[in-house]
């Protein structure tokens, strides 16, 4: 009998091995162009500013990517979409990829990061006052729905921003991420520092993507209170699924998580079907189930920590001495809710992550193996430390995994 996890792994391996990153040097851009490192050439650029009397200052930005290599998922015309973005007060910038075969995952991810970096450093669109907390990379044929509320608590309303193919020819799956910026979920500085291009990349491949507020308000100190965090992230999944019923989604959702968001992605898997974490937040009559998850470097259990872990004093202050309050420590870890084999997971971590992070990933993998749960694991051998991978094999593997699981 064929093992579906191994079959998927073989497919990912065979396809990913063809993805070799070689960065050609583009010619110097002229006004109206942007230098694409992924393609090794310049792209034609058009900038469309909102009316002078627009109240949006600094300006939120839409980077609208045209003529990508991946099949276009949304069927609504660019003319209508762009008109609406400009009317809503966005500074709209179109970049024409001219159907270059490398204008897709995994190669385009380097461009997606470079675009965000160039805005942050004022090397691109420097003549405009830009709202760096609201820069959205939108593939042609897609729209943006902002500030979709999924949870309310005193002093804070949690919401998400959804980029989705509009009027899709076929229903699409959705990917959700909980931001590593606890203050501004789309903060360009946070996305750039983490080299996080996952949602931007998957949107170019025809999936709907949602960046959600992290369940813990700023400032983040490494403590994820339970059961509150579970209430909030499940409300986010329910809300995304409910929104998708009118936006052309197929009802299948995958969380992806890095750093402080990785435990949230895993928690959605390990607490599937646990009613104790339901009934709070929006859309309580909708399912919070997820169909798969991408889990990167993070903390998954607090029962197996290194003696010199620098966070131990903070955990002890929050939960008491571990020997006397073991259950409180257990309840804080996403992995410790897993009673049996679960969904096949995609796992990855950088080879130069610290020993604490490596131990967490090793512990997660060991537990999955003990339970007989399928996993796909890819080590990132590009020595970049605590970053989301930009390695083509890994990005391609994630993309194939998500498309496969969200189509089932």
Sequence positions of predicted segments:
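Alpha/beta-hydrolase active-site loop
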Residues: 103-126, 224-244
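Short substrate-entry loop that stabilizes the transition state in hydrolases
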Residues: 53-59, 65-104, 168-172, 178-221
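Short, proline-enriched alpha-helix->beta-strand connector loops that line the catalytic pocket
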Residues: 132, 286-291, 339-345, 374
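Active-site-adjacent alpha-helix of alpha/beta-hydrolase-fold enzymes
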Residues: 194-197, 203, 310-324, 349-377
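C-terminal catalytic histidine-bearing segment of alpha/beta-hydrolase fold enzymes
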Residues: 161, 346-348, 357-408
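Mobile cap/lid helix-loop segments that gate and shape the active-site cleft of serine hydrolases
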Residues: 71-74, 141-147, 152-155, 269-274, ...
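N-terminal cap/lid segment of alpha/beta-hydrolase-fold proteins
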Residues: 25-56, 138-169
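Primarily recognizes the serine-hydrolase "nucleophile elbow" in alpha/beta-hydrolase
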Residues: 117-143, 238-307
């Amino acid at each position: 009998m064929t093992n579906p996890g191994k079959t998927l792994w073989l497919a990912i391996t065979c396809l990913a091995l063809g993805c070799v990153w070689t960065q050609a040097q583009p010619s110097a851009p002229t006004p109206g162009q942007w230098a694409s490192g992924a393609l090794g050439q310049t792209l034609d650029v058009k900038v469309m500013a909102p009316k002078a009397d627009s109240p949006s200052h600094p300006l939120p930005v839409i980077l609208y990517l045209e003529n990508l290599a991946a099949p276009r998922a949304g069927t609504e015309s660019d003319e209508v979409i762009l008109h609406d973005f400009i009317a809503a007060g966005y500074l709209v910038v179109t970049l024409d990829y001219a159907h270059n075969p490398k204008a897709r995952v995994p190669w385009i991810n380097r461009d997606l990061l470079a675009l965000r970096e160039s805005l942050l450093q004022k090397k691109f669109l420097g003549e405009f006052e830009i709202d760096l907390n609201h820069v959205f990379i939108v593939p042609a044929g897609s729209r943006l729905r902002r500030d979709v509320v999924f949870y309310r608590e005193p002093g804070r309303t949690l919401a998400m921003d959804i980029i989705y193919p509009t009027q899709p020819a076929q229903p699409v799956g959705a990917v959700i991420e909980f931001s590593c910026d606890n203050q501004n979920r789309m903060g360009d500085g946070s996305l750039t520092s983490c080299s996080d291009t996952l949602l931007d990349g998957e949107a170019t491949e025809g999936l709907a993507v949602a960046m959600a507020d992290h369940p813990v308000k700023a400032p983040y100190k490494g403590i994820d209170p339970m059961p509150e965090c579970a209430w909030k992230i499940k409300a986010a999944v329910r809300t995304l699924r409910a929104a998708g019923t009118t936006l052309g989604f197929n009802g299948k959702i995958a969380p992806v998580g890095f750093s402080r968001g990785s435990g949230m992605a895993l928690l959605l898997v390990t607490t599937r079907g646990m009613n104790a974490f339901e009934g709070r937040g929006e859309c309580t009559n909708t399912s919070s189930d997820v169909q798969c998850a991408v889990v990167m470097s993070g903390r998954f259990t607090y029962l197996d920590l290194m003696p010199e872990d620098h966070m131990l004093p903070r955990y002890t202050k929050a939960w008491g001495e571990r020997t006397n309050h073991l259950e409180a420590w257990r309840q804080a870890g996403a992995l410790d809710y897993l009673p049996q084999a679960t969904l096949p997971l995609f796992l990855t971590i950088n080879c130069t992550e610290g020993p604490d992070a490596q131990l967490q990933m090793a512990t997660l993998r060991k537990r999955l193996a003990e339970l007989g749960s399928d996993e796909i694991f890819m080590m990132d051998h590009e020595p970049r430390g605590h970053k989301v991978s930009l390695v083509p094999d890994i990005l391609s593997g994630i993309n194939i995994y998500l498309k496969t699981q969200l189509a089932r």
